[in-house]
């Protein structure tokens, strides 16, 4: 299930300080977890938009949800474990009321015990020849799986799981082999100078190589699991309690909250390097141009990280074998402070590099635009907005509305005639940014209504009087467009200011969250983490909720997500849809939606690439519904051949070109000459845009709007 959890700043002024829980300062981890349990329960009961009674029915829901989270594939626990755990099924309400850890400790201790046992089981499986000639099947659908009755059954299930992964590895080798053959044939056919070295492995060699690959993967999985501290599972346990209230109410440990803030702000204080984990070691990934790691001229992608010195007066910390997220926290720190990395270069030399931490922007978080030269000779603008980012701690920090404004100004300087704003895959963000972005396209007016748990309704208004773009506007969305994306698309649709194009409906998240710092309620200096809490529901200015139903596109174009179970309506604990009175607003008469829809539908009916996309999506849906798969290599190969015959006709999709010509800004063209990484990213972005059939039609629609179809 796709879930998009985004912070909304709105209504952080709610008087939470009036709520106070008194506890003595915890002396150990157990006392800390007990304090968190009771604090979370009290916060949920007092402040959640729609608090649930903490009773046996609630306990049963938490119990079921918990095991779906910690053992979704039913591979770890035995039926004897589940029989023992079942005695607690109606007691979890009592445990959270009392801060009782017995069930949490019982299940997590047992989980680690079973992991140790299964580690040995898999070693035994790999110590014997793998027979892929047996006529067996593996159940893929977790809902149809049964918990293993005993260790013998568990052994057999893991053996099947390993066989399946080996078969997939062999199939991957076969596909690469076929691709090499095709490339070599092309070289010979066209008498090219390229030399293609063809590596053909025997079936036994493939089996041996695939088995070794899967063995290493399984070993690394268990190694990583055992490195994880038991207390790290406490967040999972607490979220079993919180998510039964609604899927967007979540407990965040201090480090989880730090990660959330980093992503939301679109910046991090560090050295500007990706940290990658491979077979128990940590390596430097891509370096951000202009960031400390890049500026050092001593570090490179692929360097093995041996030690980190986080502060001048602290010792070097050996990070070999450490989890990547732990090492990242050593490398990050306060702006302007030094950090030292000891790395092993590819030539085995050891280098120690000291850098000063800086603010590094996460560029993929921010809006970006490009000029589109259409086949009709007109220029249009395309703006992609990945999230409604905002930095509430820094007034000078970047935010989505300022970024969009800057992109519009750049596009207007190029004399564009229409704009396509892409909100596909945008999971939301700051509610206040929605109003500010709306104000860039139209005059002041209400943009959303919010209702709290007491039924109080408030209408939020955009106060910007003068828009900077009043021309044709298309907004693209899909099933993953959620929350703030849905508010913006909904209000622009309600006013008639923009045409909404894309999936039949968006995600359907119609709730507002805020972060509650648990420390503020407790008389302690310890960090207890935070609770992201649903405190309101939001409604369109028409009074209709976005909850579950989402935003229905004016012009619908189905995609791969259309056929998947994505959206709020598929979550068991999602709040219900409802309606409140409409706000007062005046609808604009910008475009003839029906005429635009007809023109688009006529084009898409004749668009061979779009029709093939739909066929491919429907075929993938059928694959997703398959409940079992054969583990016999001959039958598996036959199945793969059949699938490849289906895939063959979809290969045209990879060669599609929408005919649009994309043009970078003059300043970006100059930057490409100096910044190779930026150049490669730009080239890849344009390459993907040229394969976008949906963008092609969005540009057709914005052209129709300009022509007043």
Residue positions per predicted region:
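Polar, glycine-rich mid-to-C-terminal structural blocks
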Residues: 484, 496, 501-566
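Bacterial Sec-dependent signal peptides at the C-terminal "C-region" and cleavage site
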Residues: 8, 18-31
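Acidic/histidine-rich, surface-exposed loop or edge segments in extracytoplasmic proteins
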Residues: 37-49, 87-91, 216-220, 386-389, ...
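PDZ/PDZ-like domain segments forming the peptide/carboxylate-binding groove
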Residues: 52, 68-69, 90, 104, ...
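Charged, amphipathic alpha-helical regulatory modules used
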Residues: 25-133
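Extended, domain-scale alpha-helical bundle/helix-rich regions
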Residues: 121-270, 274-279, 676
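Cleft-lining beta-strand/loop regions that shape enzyme active-site pockets
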Residues: 23-28, 45-55, 223-230, 246-270, ...
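Conserved functional hotspot residues or short segments at active or partner-binding sites
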Residues: 125, 141-143, 156, 160, ...
């Amino acid at each position: 299930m796709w879930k998009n959890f985004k912070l909304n700043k709105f209504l952080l002024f709610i008087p939470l300080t009036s709520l106070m829980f008194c506890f003595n300062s915890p002396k150990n981890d157990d006392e800390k977890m007990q304090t968190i349990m009771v604090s979370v329960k009290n916060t949920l009961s007092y402040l959640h938009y729609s608090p649930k009674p903490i009773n046996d029915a609630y306990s049963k829901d938490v119990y079921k949800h918990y095991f779906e989270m910690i053992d979704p594939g039913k591979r770890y626990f035995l039926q004897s474990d589940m029989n023992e755990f079942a005695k607690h099924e109606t007691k979890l309400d009592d445990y959270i009321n009392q801060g009782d850890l017995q069930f949490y400790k019982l299940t997590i201790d047992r989980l680690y015990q079973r992991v140790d046992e299964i580690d040995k089981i898999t070693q035994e499986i790999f110590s014997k020849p793998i027979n892929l000639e047996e006529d067996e099947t593996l159940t893929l659908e977790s809902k149809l799986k049964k918990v293993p009755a005993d260790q013998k059954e568990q052994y057999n299930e893991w053996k099947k799981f390993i066989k399946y992964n080996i078969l997939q590895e062999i199939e991957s080798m076969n596909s690469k082999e076929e691709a090499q053959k095709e490339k070599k044939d092309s070289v010979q056919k066209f008498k090219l100078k390229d030399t293609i070295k063809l590596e053909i492995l025997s079936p036994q060699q493939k089996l041996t190589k695939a088995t070794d690959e899967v063995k290493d993967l399984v070993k690394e999985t268990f190694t990583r699991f055992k490195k994880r501290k038991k207390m790290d599972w406490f967040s999972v346990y607490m979220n079993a309690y919180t998510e039964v209230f609604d899927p967007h109410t979540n407990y965040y440990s201090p480090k989880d909250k730090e990660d959330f803030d980093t992503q939301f702000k679109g910046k991090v204080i560090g050295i500007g390097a990706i940290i990658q984990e491979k077979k128990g070691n940590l390596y430097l990934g891509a370096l951000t141009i202009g960031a400390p790691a890049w500026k050092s001229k001593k570090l490179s992608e692929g360097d093995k990280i041996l030690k980190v010195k986080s502060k001048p007066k602290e010792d070097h910390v050996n990070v070999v074998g450490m989890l990547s997220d732990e090492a990242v926290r050593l490398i990050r720190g306060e702006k302007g402070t030094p950090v030292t990395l000891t790395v092993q270069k590819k030539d085995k030399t050891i280098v120690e590099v000291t850098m000063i931490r800086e603010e590094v922007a996460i560029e993929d978080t921010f809006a970006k635009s490009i000029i589109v030269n259409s086949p009709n000779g007109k220029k249009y603008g395309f703006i992609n907005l990945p999230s409604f980012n905002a930095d509430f701690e820094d007034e000078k920090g970047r935010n989505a509305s300022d970024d969009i404004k800057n992109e519009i100004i750049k596009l207007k300087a190029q004399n564009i005639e229409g704009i396509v704003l892409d909100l596909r895959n945008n999971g939301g963000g700051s509610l206040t940014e929605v109003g500010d972005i709306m104000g860039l396209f139209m005059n002041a007016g209400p943009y959303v209504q919010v209702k709290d748990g007491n039924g109080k309704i408030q209408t939020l208004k955009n106060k910007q009087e003068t828009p900077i773009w009043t021309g044709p506007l298309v907004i693209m969305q899909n099933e993953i467009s959620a929350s703030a994306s849905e508010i913006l698309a909904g209000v622009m649709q309600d006013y008639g200011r923009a045409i909404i194009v894309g999936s039949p409906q968006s995600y359907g998240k119609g709730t507002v969250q805020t972060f509650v710092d648990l420390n503020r309620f407790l008389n302690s200096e310890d960090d207890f983490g935070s609770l992201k809490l649903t405190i309101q529901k939001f409604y369109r200015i028409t009074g209709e909720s976005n909850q579950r139903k989402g935003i229905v596109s004016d012009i619908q174009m189905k995609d791969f997500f259309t056929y998947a179970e994505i959206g709020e309506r598929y979550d068991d604990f999602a709040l219900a849809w409802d309606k409140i009175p409409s706000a007062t607003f005046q609808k604009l008469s910008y475009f003839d939606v029906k005429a635009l829809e007809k023109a688009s539908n006529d084009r898409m009916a004749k668009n061979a690439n779009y029709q093939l996309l739909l066929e491919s999506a429907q075929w993938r849906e059928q694959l997703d519904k398959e409940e079992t798969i054969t583990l016999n290599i001959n039958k598996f190969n036959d199945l793969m051949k059949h699938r490849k015959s289906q895939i063959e006709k979809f290969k045209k999709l990879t060669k599609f070109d929408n005919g649009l010509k994309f043009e970078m800004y003059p300043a970006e063209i100059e930057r490409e000459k100096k910044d190779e990484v930026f150049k490669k990213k730009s080239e890849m972005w344009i390459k993907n845009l040229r394969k976008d059939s949906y963008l092609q039609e969005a540009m057709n629609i914005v052209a129709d709007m300009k022509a007043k179809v």
